[in-house]
């Protein structure tokens, strides 16, 4: 990619940037897209960057109106950037805790936050991340070693849209068609006719090997790629096809008398431990190696990671700190000094996450949260609230920090105004906090009975809950078989994490994805099978029609994800209102 060769002049005079229509379009798209990530996060533990969807829809609507209406102003490059900044900030709000620490806190303590306090908390940790990004911006964007791959992908799409308008219109049609198809399938399955979950035998059905009619899972499979897809398949076979029958045979897991159908809830109580251990150890090992490499490159380049605060932005930064600390004390009963201690840790870990994202494009939010949990497990042992909410502070701020750093990368290339981007990001997290919390409460009105089930596996919740439970109660609270499983899973994760980080890329690609391997232990086998199917289908199409796949695969997959998830949230709201 060579964006500077584009016919769009980079760093041109900025016109109509933070316009009412750019902001309002981003807000509307954020309202529509935020529930998609909440839904997907609770289903499979992953989310999707909504920047490209927002770019395509915003351009399609406003440029289409401009071409049909005499005198209507064209939709500018900078308005597109503000639109995607608002929408992606809203959709990325799940990093504020909605699909991991907040539900894990409810499962461990039995306490559920009301809507308004939950909105305030999610907004506060995200707001802190925005200000961390503001002060990291000059040093990180000036570091030539940090490419910010995700930001560059958004930039490439943005420039491509304005250079090839017809292509953008075609991609928008593909996006909407895929969304309509998956939404229709979900609506039929929910309201008209329950699509059968076929399985070859009753035994395989009991082990969760069924055909799940979810096009969202197929769409995610198309995005994750063949390596991750096949690893999910391998993990499902190992966990649910190998370990699960052995656990039942040895009596380590007992099923209710006369039980039939998938027995996910009973089996995952054991299987989640080796899976979580594998994921945590591999991500922490990989993060440690990346940090060492980044430390050496930063030291060699003599670059600073932080800039001296200026009075204006410093007031916003101070406000964000006051919000986070006071809400920890008021909502969770955390000691004020402990609450204050979460701030420097969150700043350090968000800075680490920003550099990792700049170098690799992969946000290590899970590893950041678990590292914070381990830190406070030492400082404040046996305290669930501080363990989870310190990690929530670190993970939430890191999530928004990395999202805004990618936007700053795009903004610098096209000559956008950083202050206006910051305002757009703040509006986005405000809208996302409200919509995300409402979507979460609509989907999961009773976390204690609904989460960690076949319908809502919530693997991120299982991970955070397991780490907090282990650090709070100690390993002695677990059975001997689970302790051995944790040890073996951790050892495998450590080995794979080290190999993945140290081997050359052309060799590391043949290793299984450690995140996917561990995740397959926490997801029903049916979910892993459908995601693997999506990955294999996309790979086969790319082998036959590589150009077609490059142009439309991600767009079609994003449509499948958005269509089912939006319909799923709407169906939950409808059923909730009907029951009310």
State what each model feature region is.
Residues 1-580:
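Alpha-helical multipass membrane-protein architecture
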């Amino acid at each position: 990619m060579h964006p500077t060769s584009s016919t769009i002049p980079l760093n041109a005079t900025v016109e109509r940037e933070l316009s009412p229509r750019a902001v309002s379009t981003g807000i509307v798209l954020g309202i529509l897209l935020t529930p998609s990530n909440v839904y997907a996060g609770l289903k499979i533990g992953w989310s999707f960057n909504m920047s490209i969807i927002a770019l395509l829809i915003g351009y399609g609507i406003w440029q289409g109106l401009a071409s049909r209406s005499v005198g209507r102003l064209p939709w500018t490059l900078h308005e597109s950037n503000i639109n995607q900044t608002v929408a992606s900030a809203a959709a990325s709000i799940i990093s504020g805790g909605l699909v991991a620490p907040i539900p894990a806190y409810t499962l461990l303590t039995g306490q559920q936050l009301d809507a308004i306090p939950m909105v305030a908390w999610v907004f506060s940790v995200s707001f802190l991340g925005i200000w961390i990004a503001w002060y990291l911006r000059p040093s990180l964007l000036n570091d030539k070693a940090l490419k910010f791959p995700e930001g560059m992908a958004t930039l490439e799409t943005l420039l491509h849209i304005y250079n090839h308008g017809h292509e953008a219109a075609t991609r928008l049609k593909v996006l909407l068609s895929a969304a309509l198809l998956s939404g229709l399938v979900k609506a039929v399955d929910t309201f008209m006719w329950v699509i059968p979950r076929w399985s070859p035998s009753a035994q395989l059905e009991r082990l969760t090997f069924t055909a799940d009619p979810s096009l969202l899972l197929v769409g995610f499979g198309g995005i994750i790629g063949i390596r991750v897809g096949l690893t999910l398949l391998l993990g499902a076979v190992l966990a649910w096809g190998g370990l699960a029958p052995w656990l039942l045979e040895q009596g380590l897991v007992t099923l209710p008398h006369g039980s039939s159908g998938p027995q996910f809830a009973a089996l995952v109580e054991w299987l989640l431990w080796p899976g979580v251990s594998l994921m945590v150890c591999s991500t922490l090992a990989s993060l440690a190696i990346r940090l060492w490499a980044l430390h050496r490159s930063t030291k060699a380049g003599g670059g600073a990671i932080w800039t001296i605060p200026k009075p204006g932005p410093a007031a916003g930064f101070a406000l964000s700190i006051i919000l986070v600390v006071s809400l920890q004390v008021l909502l969770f009963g955390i000691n004020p000094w402990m609450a204050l201690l979460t701030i420097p840790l969150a700043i350090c870990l968000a800075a680490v996450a920003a550099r990792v994202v700049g170098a690799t494009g992969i946000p290590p939010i899970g590893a950041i949260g678990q590292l914070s949990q381990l830190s406070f497990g030492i400082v404040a042992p046996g305290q669930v609230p501080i363990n989870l909410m310190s990690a929530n502070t670190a993970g939430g701020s890191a999530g928004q920090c990395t999202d805004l750093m990618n936007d700053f990368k795009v903004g610098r290339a096209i000559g956008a105004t950083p202050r206006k981007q910051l305002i757009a990001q703040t509006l986005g997290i405000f809208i996302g906090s409200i919509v995300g919390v409402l979507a979460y409460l609509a989907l999961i009105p009773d976390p204690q009975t609904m989460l960690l089930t076949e319908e809502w596996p919530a693997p991120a919740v299982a991970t955070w809950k397991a780490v907090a439970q282990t650090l709070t109660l100690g390993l002695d609270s677990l059975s001997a078989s689970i302790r051995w499983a944790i040890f073996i899973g951790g050892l495998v994760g450590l080995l794979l994490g080290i190999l993945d980080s140290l081997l050359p890329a052309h060799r590391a690609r043949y290793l299984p994805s450690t995140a996917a391997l561990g995740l397959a232990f926490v997801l029903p086998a049916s979910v892993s099978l459908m995601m693997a199917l999506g990955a294999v289908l996309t790979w086969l199409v790319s082998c036959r029609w590589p150009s077609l796949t490059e142009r439309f695969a991600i767009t079609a997959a994003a449509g499948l994800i958005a269509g089912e998830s939006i319909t799923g949230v709407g169906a939950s709201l409808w059923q909730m209102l009907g029951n009310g």
